[in-house]
Amino acid sequence: MTELAQQKCQPYQSGSSPITAEEITALQAKIPDWNLLEYEGIPRLQKLYKFANFQGAIAFTNAVGEAAEKEGHHPALLTEWGKVTVSWWTHDVGGLHQNDFIMAARTDDIYRQQNA
């Protein structure tokens, strides 16, 4: 498990601001396989994971969902045959928060554990 994945998600105040561009750059260096994109004017992290079949994709989706429930921070998940697209951003801040990077790192760990 990476150092970033070991961190706990931190509570944030409603109305808080997203993290800065400098913070995004520093945190993204810790999860270089994630894409930083903007959708409907909101920056988010996104990554596509591939699987041999639908069962693997569903198992991964459920594991990410369980991790999200434990932290109270939830992604957008698109599950298809042989692939899952995961997107992290913080709705309440209208952009990215450190929690998104923590959960992206945990998502990578879940994938590695299931595909070891």
Swiss-Prot record:
InterPro entries: PCD_sf, Pterin-4-alpha-carb_dehyd, Pterin_deHydtase. It comes from the Bacteria. One of its GO terms (biological process) is tetrahydrobiopterin biosynthetic process. Its EC number is 4.2.1.96. It catalyses: (4aS,6R)-4a-hydroxy-L-erythro-5,6,7,8-tetrahydrobiopterin = (6R)-L-erythro-6,7-dihydrobiopterin + H2O. One of its GO terms (molecular function) is 4-alpha-hydroxytetrahydrobiopterin dehydratase activity. CDD domains: PCD_DCoH_subfamily_a. This is Putative pterin-4-alpha-carbinolamine dehydratase. It comes from Microcystis aeruginosa (strain NIES-843 / IAM M-2473). The lineage of its organism: Bacteria, Bacillati, Cyanobacteriota, Cyanophyceae, Oscillatoriophycideae.
